[in-house]
Amino acid sequence: MKLYPHILSIFFLHFVFTTAFAQGKEDRLNKIFDVKKTFQKINSFKKYKIVTIKDAEKFLGSNTDNGGSLKGYFTGDSLKKIVEWVGLSNRIIQNEFYFKNDTLVFVYAVEKNYHYNNHSQTLDYTKLDLTFTGRYYFDNEKLFYSIIKNENRNKSKQKDAADFLIKSKDYMKILRAELR
C-alpha cells in the first residue's frame, strides 16, 4: 500500500506538466495567429502614405554596390510597415518589418544571391537564387518563434532578432523625420 501514494504523485505530476506544456503551446499558437492577422491586415490595406528613401547612406550609413531603399507605410502618423531593400555586389537583401502600436511584431527576411555561372566563372546579374527566408515573430520586443529556411542562419536567429529590433527603431525615427 505504500506504493499507492507514489503512483498518485506520479500521475499528478504528469498531469501538471502535460497541462502546463499544452497551455504554453496554445499561448504560442494564439500569439502566432494574432501576428499573422496583423501582417495580413497591413498587407491588404492599400491607401498608405508611403515615404521612400533611395539614398542607402541615409539609413545604412554607407552606400552599397547596387543601391538600397527604405520605404515606410503610414496611416496618419502610425507606421505600419517598413521595407528595407539592399543591393550588394553578390546578393540582394529584403527585410519587411511589421508593427502593431509602434512595436515590432514580425519580420519577413529574404536573401537572394546572384547566380554563379560555373562555365564563365562569373556572377550572372540577370538571375537570382533564393538562399534564405526567415520569419521572426515578436512579442513585447522578444523573439518568441521563428521559421528559418537556412541551417546556418538558424544558429544566429537570436542575434538576427536583436539586430532587427535595433534596425526597426532606427528606421522608424528616420522615416518619421522624412514624413514631417
PLM features: residue spans?
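Bacterial Sec-dependent N-terminal signal peptides
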Residues: 1-25
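Buried hydrophobic residues that stabilize the cores of well-folded domains
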Residues: 24-87, 91-180
